[in-house]
Amino acid sequence: MLPPRTDPPPAQHSDDAVRLTDDDAASARLSAAQLGYLQDPFASLLYRPPMPQPGAFAPQAVGRARKPPLINVGTHHRTWGIDRLVDRFLQRGGKQVVSLGAGSDTRFWRLMSRATPPDLARYVEIDFPHLTSPKAQRIARHRKLYQYLGPSSTAMPPPGHPYTVSKGGTQLSSPLYTLLPLDLRPSPSEPASSISAILSHHVLPQLDPRLPTLFLAECLFPYMSPEDSREIIKWFGETFCSCMGVVYEMVGLDDSFGNVMKRNLAVRNLSIPGSIFSTPESQAGRFTSPMLQGGKFDSAGAKTLWQIREEDVGPEELQRISKLEILDEIEELRLVLEHYVIAWGTKGECMSSISL
């Protein structure tokens, strides 16, 4: 939740830098889970903190990736807000979820391990092959993970391994869940519109266009051009008559704090072409832009994490997490939380009026 650290060495390639952003998010989730901000028994199964370099000072055990209170609180609010939107999608009869740039995310397992799991038809996670490969290995290694890969209506986990691994270990498929290795970006010589062909060729076969579908994009679009991210939103809006999208983004990168964030990202060989959507209003407007044509969503909204803290989390939950760690700098917390936003768009009658 803070501007990304500058202590990791600069990535040699921008894709390596993207991988490091997943490390940041996964280690933040692990920290929040270990300290009691989140209930997530799967975070430690899908992510392991990197071993310290030989001779490096390691004041904490490798298995405990503790983050500062500011990051833990931000991770809680991010998870709280997105979870509420996902739950409301499911309560309206949502059947399919596509997580773009899923990385080490645990949401599928958190959903399916509930006492009453949702009646999902398909859950698809997409990321670069060098990120899906270790995730597929971890899923295959832990029964606590692969036991949930069967049909969602199955009361008991199926015997054996309910999945297949393909594409050199980078893809894992089951009747309910697919981990798909895919680079959504067109080549430099291709137009942004070619993203639609990529999605139609690789992703659509995993889904049923007749079913209400949600796509999630957490900290993905900032690293894509506005044209590319618009094509993704447009494709979902055109392909599914009943659809919802949820994005988690950085905003306000043109102020002094935002400039610090950009400089720290630049040190790590990361640019943010999507930063032109600098306000919650402009983030929501991506779903209803006339440029989407037939893929335009019916309604949209957005809230900063600070607004979610003030309006949605609730006093009992805020009191609970306030007892976990001492956090004195509320103004600093507000500054950070106002630079992150959750935006959503809905299309179709059964998805109408979903919001935070």
UniProtKB/Swiss-Prot annotation:
What residues bind S-adenosyl-L-methionine, as annotated?
A: 78, 101, 127, 183-184, 218
Known Pfam families for this protein? LCM
What's the top EC group for this one? transferase
What GO molecular function terms would the record report?
Answer: protein C-terminal leucine carboxyl O-methyltransferase activity
Enzyme Commission (EC) number: 2.1.1.233
Sorted alphabetically, which Gene3D superfamilies does this protein's record hold? Answer: Vaccinia Virus protein VP39
Which ranges form a coiled coil? none
Q: Does the keyword Transferase apply?
A: yes
InterPro entries in alphabetical order: LCMT1, Ppm1/Ppm2/Tcmp, SAM-dependent_MTases_sf
What is one GO biological process annotated to this record?
A: methylation
Q: Does the keyword Isomerase apply?
A: no
What keywords appear on the UniProt entry? Methyltransferase, S-adenosyl-L-methionine, Transferase
The cross-references to PANTHER family, in alphabetical order and at most eight, read: LEUCINE CARBOXYL METHYLTRANSFERASE (PTHR13600), LEUCINE CARBOXYL METHYLTRANSFERASE 1 (PTHR13600:SF21)
What task does this protein carry out?
A: Methylates the carboxyl group of the C-terminal leucine residue of protein phosphatase 2A catalytic subunits to form alpha-leucine ester residues.
What protein does this entry describe? Leucine carboxyl methyltransferase 1
Q: Which gene encodes it?
A: PPM1
